[in-house]
Amino acid sequence: MLRTLTALVALALAHGPPAADPVVHWRHSTSLGRPDHGSLVNGVQLPAEGITFFTWDPVLLRSPDRGSRRWGNDRLVRMVQEVVGEYWLENPDAPRVCIGDLSRRHGGDFQPKHASHQNGLDVDVYYPRLDRRERPPIRPAQIDRPLAQDLVNRFIAAGATRIFVGPNTHLKGPRRIVQVLVLHDNHMHVRIAGP
């Protein structure tokens, strides 16, 4: 992780004025129950944006995502930051990664929009766009598939246990991990294992 952070700082300095990532208040989290019926203890809040990512509110259709929708298990928040950091280092011309909802501060029911996301182990990651705009794609034809596949591969390598992708994205991975699910043509749903 230190190597990744050092490289990110060097890359940020090479691309103009330094942009500091906001401080994350790390603590050990506990995810209880199931993704569709659970809670989160000592969640960690993902910052609204950073050097390598920004957040998107799928209800208000704007950036950043509200703070109440950006809580996750510490392992999930760390994974997101590491994956998008390494992705950005390998794809420096790519736009920042668009991160959607995680969970609520204490987990629990997360309506509208989500049947899961209740115990801090789920995150929505929007597919990169061909036009490089920093907003979610509206149609699958707008997806930069090589960059999207790169993100899928990185989340698999980082230990994701499930990644739901849309039927029209044509993204691939091991069947036990990457599964096609309707209503996921503009974002992937990444899940990590519970404790």
What residue ranges belong to the model's regions?
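Extended, low-complexity, intrinsically disordered C-terminal regulatory tails
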Residues: 23-32, 79-113, 162-178
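Catalytic cores and adjacent binding grooves of peptidoglycan-active enzymes
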Residues: 24, 134-195
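Active-site acidic/histidine clusters and adjacent loop/turn architecture
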Residues: 33-99, 150, 154
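Extracellular/periplasmic catalytic domains that process cell-envelope and extracellular macromolecules
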Residues: 91-92, 115-120, 156-157, 181-184
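Soluble periplasmic/extracytoplasmic beta-strand elements of cell-envelope proteins
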Residues: 98-100, 122-126, 189-191
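Solvent-exposed coil/turn segments that connect beta secondary-structure elements
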Residues: 102-105, 128-130, 168, 193-195
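Mid-length scaffold segments of soluble, non-membrane domains
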Residues: 107-110, 114-143, 147
